[in-house]
């Protein structure tokens, strides 16, 4: 039986509370981060566009925590595979557009030096016990990812397919804001100790570039880079995105709109996970036993004597 906990967001505490912060405190932190971008800049606009979806993401993350994100390897690794699929699609398109078409935005994004897909792959190989022996391992990795995607929701599949078909740096910037930003700006670094406790240090390659000294500088560089993406066209009063077929979209607006859609896509990936944690059967058994005892106690005395 599949757990419905991953979609019943009203049945569990908010993610903010699970981390020791109220939803209001989390909102204040989000707003404080937003203000680190330039006034009327792209970073602030992207943050504002995902505000509501980010609140939903916190709640969904809380559901995943309750469902076993940091207590059951099977739950964690399925989440990792889904986000790997999206991230790998994005980074593959970035490299292709930079190399084949000289896309300036992709060039700027890649200049940050991040490539999370290979790190995801190392962790997936560890989490699924895939021997690192070259081509056979890569084939096993591909098969493992395909199996997870096969049982994912239609929304998750559609989100990944959308990224695979992105044709401009403006679209990929919106995806990067959500998929990279969650690790660089968000709680990636804070998740590492819990992941290491559950899965071991060999499953923590994903956090290599977002932990350790220089975290504040990495955040600042990410924010400044986003604010710079459309600054030239803004200064020149030429906002039309010539990378798009319609010729009418503004790069600034296109990135913000794509960012908003990708945040919803990230949430779709989280709702796609439906694995029961290993400990659920024990919780259920205990609950059933408790209910049975309570029910027996409240039976009329005559009925209790006959049982």
Question: Could you say what each language-model-derived stretch is?
Answer:
Residues 2-307:
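Metal- and O2-centered redox machinery and metal/ROS homeostasis
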């Amino acid at each position: 039986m599949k757990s419905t906990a991953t979609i019943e967001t009203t049945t569990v505490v908010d993610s903010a509370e699970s981390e020791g912060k109220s939803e209001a405190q989390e909102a204040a932190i989000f707003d404080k981060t937003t203000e680190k971008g330039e006034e009327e800049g792209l970073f602030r606009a992207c943050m504002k566009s995902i505000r509501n979806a980010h609140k939903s993401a916190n709640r969904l993350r809380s559901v995943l925590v309750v469902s076993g994100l940091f207590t059951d390897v099977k739950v964690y690794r399925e989440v990792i595979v889904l986000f790997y699929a999206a991230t790998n699609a994005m980074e593959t398109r970035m490299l292709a557009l930079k190399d084949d078409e000289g896309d300036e935005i992709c060039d700027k994004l890649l200049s940050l030096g991040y490539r999370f897909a290979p790190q995801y792959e190392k962790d997936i190989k560890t989490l699924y016990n895939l021997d690192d022996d070259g081509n056979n391992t890569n084939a096993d990795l591909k098969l493992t990812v395909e199996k997870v995607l096969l049982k994912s929701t239609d929304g998750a599949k559609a989100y990944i397919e959308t990224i695979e078909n992105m044709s401009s740096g403006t679209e990929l910037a919106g995806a990067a804001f959500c998929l990279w930003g969650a690790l660089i700006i968000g709680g990636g670094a804070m998740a590492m100790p819990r992941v290491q406790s559950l899965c071991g240090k060999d499953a923590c390659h994903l956090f290599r570039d977002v932990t350790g000294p220089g975290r504040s500088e990495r955040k600042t560089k990410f924010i400044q880079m986003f604010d710079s993406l459309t600054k030239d066209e803004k200064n020149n009063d030429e906002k039309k995105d010539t990378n798009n077929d319609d010729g009418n979209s503004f790069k600034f607006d296109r990135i913000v709109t794509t960012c908003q859609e990708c945040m919803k896509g990230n949430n779709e990936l989280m709702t796609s996970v439906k694995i029961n944690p290993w400990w659920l059967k024990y919780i259920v058994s205990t609950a059933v036993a408790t209910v049975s005892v309570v029910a027996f106690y409240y039976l009329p005395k005559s009925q209790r004597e006959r049982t």
